Amino acid sequence: PEVERKSKITASRKLLKSLMLAKAKECQQEHEAREAEKVRYLAERIPALQTRGLSLSALQDLCRQLHAKVEVVDEERYDIEAKCLHNTREIKDLKLKVLDLRGKFKRPPLRRVRVSADAMLRALLGSKHKVSMDLRANLKSVKKEDTEKERPVEVGDWRKNVEAMSGMEGRKKMFDAAKSPTSQ
């Protein structure tokens, strides 16, 4: 008894494969159509050369004319290639300038916006409802103490202060001074 084996390819992959094959077929048809158009255009534009019955001088004149036409076409092709190269360089430079300008202007980091309770209620309920909610009313008020007023500033000769603070003794005084205001 043979057991039917399920396909290992999923449906999405099958769809992708069929789409890719369809696109490849379409590209192939476009390529063939382009080639046929090219052959038709060349047959229309370029008449067949009739070299039978021409003398040596007539053949040489024909060759000179063809060489002159080839030179003109080559010059045009060279000019067009030079223009293309110039344009591609210019496009590349402009792209670099755009990237450079993008890098110069940094976007500021977004900061958290504090919304008051009133504004939040207004946003939720709409502007019609006049609801005020003062959450700060029940809070205690604390006064700030001026630390500068408490400490008297010693004004004196700065040379004495420098001499007194130099060395290990000065370091000890600074350490003791830093301890004393916090302990009170």
Swiss-Prot record:
PTM description: In the muscle sample, approximately 25% of the chains were blocked. Pro-1 is probably acetylated. The N-terminus is blocked.
Residue numbers of N-acetylproline PTMs: P1
Phosphoserine modification, residue list: S55
Residue ranges of the region described as Involved in binding TNC: 1-45
Protein's UniProt keywords contain Metal-binding: no
Domain of life: Eukaryota
Molecular function in Gene Ontology: actin binding
Any one Gene Ontology BP term: cardiac muscle contraction
Function: Troponin I is the inhibitory subunit of troponin, the thin filament regulatory complex which confers calcium-sensitivity to striated muscle actomyosin ATPase activity.
Stated family: Belongs to the troponin I family.
Name of the molecule in the record: Troponin I, slow skeletal muscle
Protein source organism: Oryctolagus cuniculus (Rabbit)
Encoding gene (name): TNNI1
